[in-house]
Amino acid sequence: MFMDRWLFSTNHKDIGTLYLLFGAWAGMAGTALSLLIRAELGQPGALLGDDQIYNVIVTAHAFVMIFFMVMPIMIGGFGNWLVPLMIGAPDMAFPRMNNMSFWLLPPSFLLLLASSMVEAGAGTGWTVYPPLAGNLAHAGASVDLTIFSLHLAGVSSILGAINFITTIINMKPPAMSQYQTPLFVWSVLITAVLLLLSLPVLAAGITMLLTDRNLNTTFFDPAGGGDPILYQHLFWFFGHPEVYILILPGFGMISHIVTYYSGKKEPFGYMGMVWAMMSIGFLGFIVWAHHMFTVGMDVDTRAYFTSATMIIAIPTGVKVFSWLATLHGGNIKWSPAMLWALGFIFLFTVGGLTGIVLANSSLDIVLHDTYYVVAHFHYVLSMGAVFAIMGGFVHWFPLFSGYTLDNTWAKIHFTIMFVGVNMTFFPQHFLGLSGMPRRYSDYPDAYTTWNTVSSMGSFISLTAVMLMVFMIWEAFASKREVAAVELTTTNIEWLHGCPPPYHTFEEPTYVVLK
């Protein structure tokens, strides 16, 4: 029975739960790695050893957080749980493929961990640029294992994307048009399209790197007529859409949370929200070289990528102001989920502003590979994606489990986390503007103060993570049943009770849309 339910599962709710548990577990590993980084940087001088081990930790931290925490939780966890419920489908379109998508992730994670255990580990950074990732600078199997890990995670995501696209387009009730699906469903659909289009390019790039390392090809080796810049183009053509893949489902969740706790029956500017997400998805594919301003591009090329990157601020602004307009005039309920959503809007906007700074190629040439960039993307990820995940978790936890979290603890948790992440990442803007470079385990004494502050902040965040584990235990131990859910007609995922039955629909849904 246990094997049938959890190993061979074809139920979207169980697979969603598996994704959430796996993501939480990987998140702990990723957090541990980040604390090692901040412990090393807490003061000048060496703590862990040389720069190789430090860079192995940095690389693993990035891969674990992106591929094994944010993506499994947002797309696999919330996506699997909520999309079928929100469109009235009995399950996903391909339930067994859904199971395979999940079970490709633990072996992938295992390969990534193995890569750090053999030889010297993969100290390449998550970008895995040759020639550093080549077989001279990284002899041994480490980088090869990392590449295989990425292949598995990529196949998992591509299969999941096919599944979501098919489900969302094909399994709605006949009366429901695409423009009547909730915004979270839209966000997952657009994310899935981005995955489907970008991951094969990454697969091509890392496969060429694999053959360069092992089969004597020279795709990225000038000695044989290759070009390492080609790898950068292939990687970032995936890498930039990837960062939008990480944030788009969060946009969808924030729209639902803000609408719900403002007491509104729909978000402000539904169509604008949809078109904004589609625009962001499209533009995400034509700005990749802004990660490469320092490789020596023409001034015309730089001008194009600068302008195109800034254009993304427009649909993003549409979303931010629509969330604020949804709040306007509402009967606002200051629940923990609402606090996460408001924190998301504020901090994501701050991260977006530093992004506009970095979009200027002239400025980026100075700021590239400094802590300013680290501060920028951690504001949009560590306070964008993670805040969206936390908001979604405390909002939908009663739906998933049937129990309620303690409100006071949840608010305390938010406060500690808010202080922690800001104390960690705000000082990094100062470090970057002062020229402290990324990916080094040691630094001149002049940078000590802000690094110490940053490292203290990371330990405050650790306290918040531990408090969250306690909160979840407390909820399951206290067994407070869900009393009543408001607004069920506009939030149909709640319609079937908390938690919903194992099989939501025994027969196809019939929807009458006025």
Curated annotation (Swiss-Prot):
Q: Which residues lie on this side of the membrane: Mitochondrial intermembrane?
A: 41-50, 118-140, 213-227, 287-298, 358-370, 434-446
The keyword Lipid biosynthesis is annotated on this UniProt entry: no
The biological process GO terms on file are: electron transport coupled proton transport; mitochondrial electron transport, cytochrome c to oxygen
EC annotation? 7.1.1.9
* Cross-link 1'-histidyl-3'-tyrosine (His-Tyr) per UniProt, renumbered positions: H240-Y244
Residue numbers binding Cu cation? H240, H290, H291
Instruction: Name the CDD domains for this protein.
Output: Cyt_c_Oxidase_I
List the ranges whose topology is Mitochondrial matrix.
Answer: 1-11, 87-94, 171-182, 262-269, 328-335, 401-406, 479-514
Amino-acid positions noted as binding O2 in the UniProt annotation, renumbered to this chain: Y244
Major site of localization recorded for this protein = mitochondrion
Where along this sequence does the record place binding of Mg(2+)? H368, D369
- Annotated Na(+) binding sites: E40, G45, S441
Q: Which reaction does it catalyse?
A: 4 Fe(II)-[cytochrome c] + O2 + 8 H(+)(in) = 4 Fe(III)-[cytochrome c] + 2 H2O + 4 H(+)(out)
Output the Gene Ontology cellular-component terms: mitochondrial inner membrane; respiratory chain complex IV
Q: Which PANTHER family match?
A: CYTOCHROME C OXIDASE SUBUNIT 1
This protein is called Cytochrome c oxidase subunit 1
Q: What is the lineage of its organism?
A: Eukaryota, Metazoa, Chordata, Craniata, Vertebrata
Q: What gene is this protein a product of?
A: MT-CO1
